[in-house]
Amino acid sequence: INEINLYSTEMAAALCALDNAKISANMSNRLSEAIVDSYKKTNGAPITFEQILTNYQSKLQNPEKDDSISSILKQLVRNKLFENEDKANLINECFIVKMDAFPKDGPIAKAIVYFLISKLNLIYEQLEKQAVSDDYVQIRHFTIIDEAHYMLDFDNRPLRNLIAVGRNKGLSIILATQNMASFQSKHFDFYANAQYPLIMKQQTITDSVIKDLFGVSGRELQEIRTEIAGLQKGELIIKDQMAFALDLGKKYKKIKVSHLI
């Protein structure tokens, strides 16, 4: 029961995070209660958005009148995003999730990423640590999110948790965006947790980001700005970990690649 109560609070926070609409404390509490009621009716078995919506509406004075929560739930139900049972092997198979049918900054696209990443969290928490030798570490899985800025501007807890969990489980997470400032999220310090920041040519170069990544200012800052602005196709700027640690020489390297994976 305690686990369900905790999960109901987390799920309520998740649904609230998917939309920018203002959600009152009463709505959030009502949603948590609806989730708990749904689990009671399934005796702890997995629940669906339809069940949550039905139980949520039963707590409204006028079930026909939508509020912010019921509106989100109806969108999730209407779009039939997920199966009622697991049929995909997210570890041993490769999937491309196409989301171009949905507005990238809307609740449906966010829900797809949010709950898929949540599922990966559950899987990776159960795995043994990655194999490590003197020369190599095991990479089990790549999770790549293109146009990631749409997924960084809200409280995306599963993504934060996956970054933390994946570090010693052989998970590589690649967050790709055209604007380096997108990683300066108020919800999470993505730069502090980025082991290998890769910078391609940028239309907008943010000084505060360069300072955070490379620990530079003044002439060194301007030098890196110039290098980024002059990057050609396939060229990247990366942090020189050795120079950064020793505080010697240039804090960056310029490399040329044909592909990243």
Task: Tell what function each PLM region has.
Residues 1-171, 184-187, 227-244:
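P-loop NTPase motor domains
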Residues 101-103, 179-181, 204:
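Active-site-proximal loop/turn and secondary-structure-junction residues that shape catalytic pockets
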Residues 72-79, 175-179, 214-218:
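A short linear-motif detector with a strong N-terminal bias
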Residues 95-97, 174, 196-198:
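Hydrophobic/aromatic beta-strand patches that form the interior of the parallel beta-sheet core
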Residues 20-30, 183-261:
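P-loop NTPase motor core of the ASCE superfamily
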Residues 168-171, 176-183, 201:
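Conserved H-loop
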